[in-house]
């Protein structure tokens, strides 16, 4: 796979070196590898003070296991993270799977306190997949016991090293946005605690679209309308301030683009070139 990191503000890009053959072979030539994996690549926030530093994570979803390569612009090298079987990470001992429990089209990927979080698409599974970018290790994290809508979660930073979790709960046709906080390692309780329940709407299905830093982005379909006998249903976007939990309308996406992917774009990415006078 060829990959490049782009700086849209300065219209620059850096072409990454290929993964060394020996690293690729160590991951691809595996006894359990029967099919070509689907891959995803994304930026990894780094703690370095250098403005031009960046990291890239290349994730390979095999049918029975998960493998990861990580690139650092500081070392200019790829590093292989030990692959893990899905039955070790999310399925429990003694079980197996023939498909990745992370859906390539509908899953959400969230970042908080140096860790990435993914929601499993397995029905009834109460775990999040976690990757610690400092330890370069996979693990799992439990979810709140309350029944939440599938594929409708978001992880945020709640402050003081505590995790925050947003989820949508539906009951009798009414949708609520539930906000949970998980205590940090220094607190007596590390269980999820319900912080607040925010009524969203009735009759129309809301969806968590993205989350980053300060804001959560919700999508909510509006009422059906007809234009020249053709049905249209627009998607309204609502932002949620993670600190104040205040809701605000952002914009409305027309019917033709309502089901397309959406991300939050805030601040500017690290420049790929050092500042010059």
PLM ranges: what are they?
Residues 2, 47-48, 73, 107-108, ...:
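C-terminal closing repeat unit and adjoining cap/tail of repeat-based domains
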Residues 1-162, 169-176, 187, 266:
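A sequence/structural signal of beta-propeller blade repeats
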């Amino acid at each position: 796979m060829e990959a490049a990191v782009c700086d849209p503000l300065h219209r620059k890009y850096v072409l990454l070196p290929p993964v060394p053959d020996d690293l690729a072979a160590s991951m691809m030539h595996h006894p359990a590898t029967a099919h070509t994996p689907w891959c995803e690549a994304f930026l990894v926030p780094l703690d370095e003070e250098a403005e031009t530093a960046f990291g890239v994570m290349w994730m390979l979803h095999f049918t029975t296991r998960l493998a990861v390569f990580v690139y650092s612009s500081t070392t200019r090298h790829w590093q292989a993270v030990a692959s893990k079987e899905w039955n070790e990470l999310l399925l429990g001992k003694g079980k197996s799977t023939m498909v990745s429990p992370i859906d390539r089209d509908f899953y959400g990927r969230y970042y908080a306190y140096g860790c990435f979080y993914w929601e499993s698409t397995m029905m009834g599974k109460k775990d999040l997949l976690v990757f610690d970018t400092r330890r370069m290790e996979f693990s799992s994290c439990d979810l709140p016991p309350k029944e939440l809508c599938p594929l409708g979660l978001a992880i945020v930073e709640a402050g003081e090293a505590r995790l925050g979790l947003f989820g949508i709960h539906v009951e009798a046709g009414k949708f609520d946005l539930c906000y949970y906080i998980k205590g940090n390692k220094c607190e007596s309780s590390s269980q999820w605690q319900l912080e607040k329940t925010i009524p969203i709407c009735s009759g129309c299905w809301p969806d968590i679209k993205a989350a980053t830093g300060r804001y959560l982005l919700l999508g909510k379909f509006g009422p059906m309308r007809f234009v020249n006998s053709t049905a249209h249903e627009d998607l309204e976007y609502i932002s949620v301030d993670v600190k104040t939990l205040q809701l605000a309308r952002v914009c409305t996406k027309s019917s033709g683009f309502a089901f397309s992917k959406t991300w939050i774009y805030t601040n500017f990415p690290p420049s790929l070139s050092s500042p010059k006078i």
